[in-house]
Amino acid sequence: MKTRTFHADRSQPQPGEIFVFGSNQAGYHGGGAARAAHQQYGAEWGVPEGATGNSYAIPTCDAAINPLPLAQIGDAVQRFLAEAVAHPERSYFVTRIGCGIAGHRDSDIAPMFSGAPSNCSLPDTWAPYF
């Protein structure tokens, strides 16, 4: 069984942890966790997915800020998980991606992270789904 690590929702990552947040397909990080990612963790404007600075973007909305379908978010989550598995030396602080501005339910998003490796800290609000 995998060791799961959870952090308090809305808490801050520890020094060195990579801030994983929900973005939009335009890479305009203007609100919610995306804004924090841009202002505090080096997320680059115009980059909708992947690692920049000390952050990792997972698209949850389209360019017009409409929620993406769950299957599309799930595909992006799988790409992130592959990155986390490939880099066990890194620690990832996953926010409640898709559950803020995108409006999805925790019960829909949390299970997408069931394969998360032990170097991913997940929001404690997702603990019941594992």
Would you name each region that the model predicts?
Residues M1-F130:
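Macrodomain-like recognition of ADP-ribose-binding/processing modules
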